[in-house]
From Swiss-Prot:
<dbReference type="InterPro" id="IPR045864">
    <property type="entry name" value="aa-tRNA-synth_II/BPL/LPL"/>
</dbReference>
<feature type="binding site">
    <location>
        <begin position="158"/>
        <end position="160"/>
    </location>
    <ligand>
        <name>substrate</name>
    </ligand>
</feature>
<comment type="function">
    <text>Catalyzes the transfer of endogenously produced octanoic acid from octanoyl-acyl-carrier-protein onto the lipoyl domains of lipoate-dependent enzymes. Lipoyl-ACP can also act as a substrate although octanoyl-ACP is likely to be the physiological substrate.</text>
</comment>
<dbReference type="InterPro" id="IPR000544">
    <property type="entry name" value="Octanoyltransferase"/>
</dbReference>
<protein>
    <recommendedName>
        <fullName>Octanoyltransferase</fullName>
        <ecNumber>2.3.1.181</ecNumber>
    </recommendedName>
</protein>
<feature type="binding site">
    <location>
        <begin position="171"/>
        <end position="173"/>
    </location>
    <ligand>
        <name>substrate</name>
    </ligand>
</feature>
<feature type="active site" description="Acyl-thioester intermediate">
    <location>
        <position position="189"/>
    </location>
</feature>
<dbReference type="Pfam" id="PF21948">
    <property type="entry name" value="LplA-B_cat"/>
</dbReference>
<comment type="similarity">
    <text>Belongs to the LipB family.</text>
</comment>
<comment type="pathway">
    <text>Protein modification; protein lipoylation via endogenous pathway; protein N(6)-(lipoyl)lysine from octanoyl-[acyl-carrier-protein]: step 1/2.</text>
</comment>
<dbReference type="InterPro" id="IPR004143">
    <property type="entry name" value="BPL_LPL_catalytic"/>
</dbReference>
<dbReference type="GO" id="GO:0036211">
    <property type="term" value="P:protein modification process"/>
</dbReference>
<feature type="binding site">
    <location>
        <begin position="91"/>
        <end position="98"/>
    </location>
    <ligand>
        <name>substrate</name>
    </ligand>
</feature>
<keyword id="KW-0808">Transferase</keyword>
<keyword id="KW-0963">Cytoplasm</keyword>
<dbReference type="GO" id="GO:0005737">
    <property type="term" value="C:cytoplasm"/>
</dbReference>
<dbReference type="InterPro" id="IPR020605">
    <property type="entry name" value="Octanoyltransferase_CS"/>
</dbReference>
């Protein structure tokens, strides 16, 4: 489908452009590997507050993650015999399902360069998603008191972040053309009565290759990011911690 990337907004929430490495993976990545990459970059920013930030755009191999304090009651399977890898991690929120066909975004940003306010940051991530969907002709919706993004009552994007010393990790997951059947093994985000959806239910044939450039542009606009592009991550293990 034709997409007008020029429809994305140009107003940044930062008065100063931020040099940021952009890593894009061409193959699904194991969750624990992507988590390690974020932790490594977080450590670099702890050591050098002037270091570039980083963002990962990727897909995961199938897995389920539980946020801090998340209830295992939202897992509709035996935790000793999960249908896919299960991880308890250091982000907010309840259970999330990752799988191919879902665009996952992991910004490792220093909020001291923006606003030291996690609620502000969550709303910015929601706006990134709203702007992406607007280019596609879709009206993404927030729900009062909840975090994420909905289309016609179906949750199409989950957001869960971690933050140490104002350096972020984890991020958002947007369902593009993924198989929704495996979401039935959990109560997504712990929200009973809130079905999940994917973008190609509204735009048949929509692909990750069409959505990913829109996500890059929306992130750049929203956070004033100037991308530094390293060598492509053709294989999951290609990232070097001293990049």
């Amino acid at each position: 489908m034709p997409i007008d990337i020029g429809k994305l907004g140009t107003t940044s929430t930062s008065a100063q452009s931020q040099s940021t490495f952009l890593f894009e993976c061409s193959e699904p990545v194991p969750f624990e590997m992507a988590w390690l990459w974020q932790q490594q970059w977080q450590q670099q920013l702890f050591a050098n507050p002037l270091a570039p930030q980083a963002v990962w755009l990727l897909q995961h191999q199938a897995c389920y993650t539980l946020g801090r304090g998340a209830s295992e009651a939202n897992l509709l399977f035996d935790v000793n015999n999960p249908p896919a890898a299960l991880h308890r991690i250091d982000r907010g929120g309840e259970v999330t399902h990752h799988l191919p066909g879902q665009l996952v975004v992991y910004p490792v940003l220093d909020l001291r360069r923006y606003q030291t306010d996690l609620h502000w940051y969550l709303r910015q991530l929601e706006q990134v998603l709203i702007d992406v969907l607007a280019v596609l002709g879709l009206a993404g919706e927030r729900l009062q008191g909840l975090t994420g993004l909905w289309l016609e009552g179906r949750k199409v994007a989950a957001i869960g972040v971690g933050c140490r010393r104002w350096i972020t990790q984890h991020g958002l997951a947007l369902n593009v053309d993924c198989d929704l059947e495996s979401f039935s093994a959990v109560v997504p985000c712990g929200l009973v009565g809130h079905p999940v959806g994917r973008l190609n239910q509204w735009i048949p044939g929509l692909t990750m290759a069409e959505v990913q450039p829109l996500m890059r542009q929306s992130l750049s606009d929203r956070f004033g990011l100037v991308w530094q592009i390293p060598e492509p991550l053709a294989k999951p293990g290609a990232f070097a911690s001293d990049a």
